[in-house]
Amino acid sequence: MSSAPPGPAAPRLCCMEKGPDGYGFHLHGEKGKPGQYIRLVEAGSPAERSGLRAGDRLLEVDGTNVERESHQQVVERIRAAAGAVRLLVVQPQPEEQPPKTHSDPDGEAQREPPAAETPAAERSGPEERELRPRLCRIKKGPNGYGFNLHSEKSRPGQYVRAVDPDSPAEAAGLRAQDRIVEVNGTSVEGKQHADVVAAIKAGGDETKLLVVGVLADEFFKKCRVVPSEAHLAGPLPEPMANGDVEKENGGEPRLNSVSERPPSPALATSPEGSETHSEPDTQEGDKRSSAPSSLLDLDIPLAVAKERAHQKRTSKRAPQMDWSKKNELFSNL
C-alpha cells in the first residue's frame, strides 16, 4: 500500500533582534509573481539563530499578512520594526521554489542579485545595488569577448567604451562606461592600458572582471576606498564629507577633500611607448607644491617672471601624440 504524499509544511514563527550587521538575511521577490522569499541566511546571524532558512516564503511581518504586498512594501515593514521583528514563514513545496538563476532587463549576469532583492532589509533596493561593484565572468565567443576597452586623458583608469549586442560580455552584465577595477582577481588600479589588455588576454578563453558603474565609481571615490570583491555583498563604506579629519597610519590628522587623488604620473605610456592618458590634476599639484618657493621671488623683474612661467608650462606639456598609434588606446577584446 503506497503512502500518502506529505502535506504542506507547517508555518514557522521566527523572532529575531537586529545585530550590528542587521538581521542577516536576503529578501528576494520575482517580478510579476506574488510572494517574497528568503534567498540567503548568513551564518551566525540573528536570522539563522531564529530558525529562518533559505527558500522560506514570507507570510507575515509582525502579525500582518504580506503575501500580496510588493517587495518594497515588505522591506519597509521590516525596516519599520524597532530593532526586532517577527516573521511567519513556510518552506514551500518543490514546485513553488523560486528559480535559482535570474536575469534583469539590463542583461546582467546571473551572478548579480535581481532588482528586487534586499540584504536583510538594510538597503534601499535598486539605489544601493547601483553603488556596488559587479563581478562579470566572461567566456570568449567566436568573435571574442565582445567589448571595447579604452583609456581617457581626462581621467585615470580603464573604461568599457562599448559592449556588442548579444555578446558574451553583454550576457555577463558588462556595460558601457564601466571602469575595470580587477582582472582575474588582481587589481589594475593605476595600471597602463597595455598592461590591462595583456592581463585580460592572459586569461585565455575566460576572464573575470570586477567593474564599477558610473554611480558606484563616484561613490567609492567619495569614500576614498578601492572597490573589491568584499563589497559585492558585504557592508558598503561611508562617504567622507569635505572637512572630515582623518589620521593615516597613526600620523598627524589631515584634511580630506573629495578632489584629492593619489599621486600619479603626468603621462602614462604603454611598453610600446604610446601615450595612454595624461592626468591634468598633477599639474595642479605641481602648482601647489611650487607655491611656497614662488613667494620668495616676488622682487624679480616682471619680464623674468614671465619667462620662467613660460618655461614651466612648456616643460610640463605632454609630447605630441603619434596618431599612427592611436589604435593602442582602444582595444577590442
From Swiss-Prot:
PDZ domain sequence ranges: 13-93, 135-215
Name this protein carries in UniProt: Na(+)/H(+) exchange regulatory cofactor NHE-RF1
Low complexity bias: start-end ranges: 112-122
Composition bias type Basic and acidic residues, residue spans: 97-111, 124-133, 274-289, 323-333
UniProt-listed GO biological process terms: bile acid secretion; glutathione transport; negative regulation of cell motility; negative regulation of phosphatidylinositol 3-kinase/protein kinase B signal transduction; negative regulation of platelet-derived growth factor receptor signaling pathway; protein localization to plasma membrane; regulation of protein kinase activity; renal absorption
GO CC annotation, single: cell periphery
Gene: NHERF1
UniProt keyword Repeat, yes or no: yes
